[in-house]
């Protein structure tokens, strides 16, 4: 049997992983500047963590989730999204306590799993960058989250993105809207897909997210939740949009927007990218919203929360098209060549000294001929080559060459310990 990776997974090889590292580093630094701290949760949880949060009728739980019974008979699921595990950790570790500063704001960069049809930017194992903030119901918290999402995409170099927003209102609004959807879809129930017929009795809001052609023909005339928002929900939504306008963040009021998970309340949003080189129509790369009752679902206290998640695979597709500089392979600072007896170990010592000073450095462990060593230095995109020869070593000197223009300089072995000064001389 040929050994190969499972369908829906990819190997991110060293030639590509550097760009992923850059993107994740930008994201980490961005979140830290906003005082969001990293949280790491298990890649698998008890099944109920996701069935409670995402909803039994959601496609994520009913069709896409990897779940199984482990050897102890426990019903386990691989993480299909990031929020539920973070909420579980928030409750289990009593992070709602008075000794924890609120809002409690975290970020994560995790691998996640969904059984979907693999396609460009969508795999069965994928990566998600996300943030969650617990403890504030203020519209400022929503705006903070929206602003962070907007500014992070800008900092990463994403272009042509558009913010779509909608409001799902409060519990009373959802209940009234639920009844309106039932009344609308019930007369045509027999014409709906099997999934939507089931959803009609369990969670008719899910029908609005259907991709089935049998359902889609009824969606344009379906009731809009904006018509059911109460005064409080409308005022909250207006406060948020007013602040977005003051911040210069453009948005589209999207009455058709619903999120694919059941836990959202209040504002929901998606950032969509239009790029004809990638997709025929605008595609979502970031989505999120407010979820004020999810902590209670996990037996925690009433806690408002808001967050977003980015599909990293889709993000990388966009960035490769729109910010190709992130995908330039980075070289190393120094490659150390050597020739002659007694120079091999000195190359090791020189590399160690350079690394201790914060430089990247490599030497040829295979001790090839000097010409081959220089060829390797070129292939690894070294900025400088240091050459150690037996005679030069005996005299306590060595040669450093800048490959971009061929400029060279001789220096003493002691100068190795102050390499930044040497580089400055080369720059003169």
Curated annotation (Swiss-Prot):
Gene Ontology MF term list: ATP binding; catalytic activity, acting on a protein; histidine-tRNA ligase activity; transferase activity
Pfam families tied to this protein: HGTP_anticodon, tRNA-synt_His
BP GO annotations: histidyl-tRNA aminoacylation
Catalysed reactions, as listed in the record: tRNA(His) + L-histidine + ATP = L-histidyl-tRNA(His) + AMP + diphosphate + H(+)
Keyword Acetylation: no
Gene3D superfamilies xrefs: Anticodon-binding domain (3.40.50.800), Bira Bifunctional Protein, Domain 2 (3.30.930.10)
Listed name of the protein: Histidine--tRNA ligase
Protein family (similarity comment): Belongs to the class-II aminoacyl-tRNA synthetase family.
Cellular component aspect of the GO annotation: cytoplasm
Cellular localization per UniProt: Cytoplasm
InterPro entries from the UniProt entry: aa-tRNA-synth_II (IPR006195), aa-tRNA-synth_II/BPL/LPL (IPR045864), Anticodon-bd (IPR004154), Anticodon-bd_dom_sf (IPR036621), His-tRNA-ligase (IPR015807), HisRS-like_core (IPR041715), HisRS/HisZ (IPR004516)
Membrane found in the keyword field: no
SUPFAM superfamilies membership: Class II aaRS ABD-related, Class II aaRS and biotin synthetases
Keyword terms: Aminoacyl-tRNA synthetase, ATP-binding, Cytoplasm, Ligase, Nucleotide-binding, Protein biosynthesis
Organism: Lactobacillus johnsonii (strain CNCM I-12250 / La1 / NCC 533)
Entry's EC annotation: 6.1.1.21
């Amino acid at each position: 049997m040929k050994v190969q990776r499972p369908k829906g997974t990819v190997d991110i090889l060293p030639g590509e992983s550097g760009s992923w590292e850059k993107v994740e580093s930008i994201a980490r630094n961005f979140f830290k500047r906003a005082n969001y701290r990293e949280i790491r949760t298990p890649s698998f949880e008890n099944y109920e963590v996701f069935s409670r949060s995402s909803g039994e009728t959601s496609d994520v739980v009913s069709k896409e989730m990897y779940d199984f019974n482990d050897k102890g008979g426990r019903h386990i699921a691989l993480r299909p999204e990031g929020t539920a595990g973070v909420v579980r950790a928030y409750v289990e570790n009593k992070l709602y306590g008075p000794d924890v500063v609120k809002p409690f704001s975290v970020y994560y960069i995790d691998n996640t799993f969904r059984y979907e049809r693999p396609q460009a930017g969508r795999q069965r194992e994928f990566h998600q960058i996300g943030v969650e903030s617990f403890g504030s119901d203020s519209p400022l918290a929503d705006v903070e989250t929206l602003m962070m999402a907007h500014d992070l995409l800008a900092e990463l170099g994403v272009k042509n993105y558009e913010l779509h927003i909608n409001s799902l209102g409060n519990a009373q609004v959802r209940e009234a809207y639920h009844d309106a959807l039932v009344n609308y879809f019930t007369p045509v129930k027999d014409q709906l897909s099997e999934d939507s017929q089931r959803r009609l009795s369990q969670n008719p809001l899910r029908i609005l997210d259907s991709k089935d052609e049998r359902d889609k023909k009824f969606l344009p005339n379906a009731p809009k939740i904006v018509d059911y928002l109460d005064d409080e929900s409308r005022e909250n939504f207006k406060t948020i949009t007013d602040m977005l306008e003051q911040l210069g963040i453009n948005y589209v009021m999207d009455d058709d927007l619903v999120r694919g998970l059941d836990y959202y309340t209040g504002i929901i949003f998606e950032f969509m990218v239009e790029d004809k080189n990638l997709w025929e129509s605008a595609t979502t790369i970031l989505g999120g919203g407010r979820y004020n009752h999810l902590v209670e679902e996990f037996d925690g206290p009433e806690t408002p929360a808001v967050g977003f998640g980015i599909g990293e695979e889709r993000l990388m597709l966009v960035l490769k098209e729109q910010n190709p500089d992130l995908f330039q392979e980075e070289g190393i600072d120094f490659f150390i060549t050597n020739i002659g007896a007694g120079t091999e170990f000195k190359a090791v010592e020189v590399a160690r000294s350079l690394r201790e000073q914060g430089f990247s450095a490599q030497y040829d462990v295979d001790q090839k001929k000097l010409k081959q060593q220089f060829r390797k230095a070129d292939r690894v995109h070294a900025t400088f080559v240091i050459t150690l020869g037996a005679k030069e070593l005996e005299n306590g000197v060595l040669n450093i060459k800048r490959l971009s223009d061929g400029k060279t300089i001789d220096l003493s072995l002691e100068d190795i310990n102050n390499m930044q000064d040497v580089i400055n001389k080369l720059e003169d």
